[in-house]
Amino acid sequence: MTTAPRTPNPLAVLAQTRLLPAISPLESAVVNAWADACIEHGVLALELLLRGDGSERAAFGAITRLASSHPQLAVGVGTVFDARTAQRACDAGARIVVSPITDPATGSTCAAAGVDWLPGAFTPTEIALAERSGATQVKLFPALAINAPAFLRSHLATKPSSRIIPTNVSLDEIPALVAAGAAGFGVGERLLAGADPRSASAIGERLHAALSVAGGGAY
């Protein structure tokens, strides 16, 4: 008897691999290439970014399709600002909801649905709010707007238990962030740096390099 692949826990994947790929646009060729590359390299979580009108339908439809075609991949939705959108994502089968802000109602919605939540924060106060609201890992956003390594060193010196995830980082930025104590990284367009987003092999090469630099391992 063949056992169906079990969808992993996205935050567990992030803790092991130290990577959470996030992609846009959501055309099928791009989504499938990323999904195939993620599975090949053991990065078994993928975030689909909401970007303007029509993106919710595209993201939620992609989740449904990937659940059927790539059941071993935990797929989630990013750029979620409110509980209504979070509920729609959960109903569509998302396994993680990622936000640029910390909205406790969104966290409660995810908890009720048994879905992982990765909220965003930009200050120590916002990080504390996210943690008090149930987050075990917190996205640093917008990480590109500050000296992220310096921020991490300062924050973790006072709150070493925080698990902070800078996002939209390039391969060259990862070593300094690792040294500063980042718990993981959101990667996507800047990781590709001009490589074909429809090529699973090109994406896989960058994921392999990022895993090596980040100190993560296949899940």
Q: What are the residue ranges of the model-derived segments?
A:
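Conserved N-terminal beta1-alpha1 strand-loop-helix module at the mouth
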Residues: M1-A92, A112, L171-D172, D196-Y219
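Glycine-rich phosphate-binding active-site loops on the catalytic face of alpha/beta enzymes
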Residues: I96-T106, K139-A148, G181-I203
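Shared catalytic-loop signature of beta/alpha-barrel
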Residues: L129, A145-I165, V169-L171
